[in-house]
Amino acid sequence: MKIQFKFLVNIFLFLFLLNSCDNQEDSNNDETIGLEIHQEDQLEGKKELNGFQIAYKVVEKSNYYTVKVAINDVRLVASIDYDTEFIEIDGKNVVLSSKEKETLLMIGEEISAYLFKDGSVDDFTMAEFTLLKLLEYWAKSPSNYSYEKIVFKGNQTNLVKGNDDGITCIRKNTYVTAVYDDNEGQIYRDRELVNGDRCLGRCGSGCPGVFSIASAWTKDCLDHDQCGRVLGGSTNPFDRNCGDEYAQAADDFLFGVLRGCRG
């Protein structure tokens, strides 16, 4: 009887210690991204990174998502309704430095590594998806880009310059004509191979993606990529000529994957 009791006590202690270790590991992982709240309808945290104080928050209510990201005193805000494909993105015309953009990518990479630490990239909440997509979108703006207010309502937008194709899926390894313009309004048309030169047409930079999450392949993203290749730098294809193409790709970043634009 004593032996049986001692055996049960040892089993209990083993399970208690095992659970404590798991909880400690989860707590340590939370701290790496400054996570404070992690629920299906909310993701929130803050931490110091790369010399900046970063705060992020995404909240869902009736499939309407509000995202707020702060880097020191700079605030970036977005509202997304996935039912109606409504987007409003506003940065109050702030211009981020290259280091600030680098920091947004860094926090996104850390959050992505935390969320997909088990290797699966298909199991995510829409709150997680929305935050990662916006972090990448904001971080990959053209040089000296002013984060003006952008509004998409279905196929309509407040943008007045450029050629917005809505969310038009394109297929990898096919030829599609990219249409874009420069800062003077001159229009260019180039027939290009989708998935050619550094993954032309992918909503995001390079291959594989910056974060471990599915990406869309769309016409607006092709237009922006080709604009950058021709009018931007050879290694960092983002400049003032391609700001309108960048803005027009906002809905592609967020809704392209959900529309099935996976190439």
Language-model segments: residues:
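C-terminal motif of bacterial Sec signal peptides marking the signal peptidase cleavage site
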Residues: 17-20
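Bacterial signal peptide processing site
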Residues: 22-24
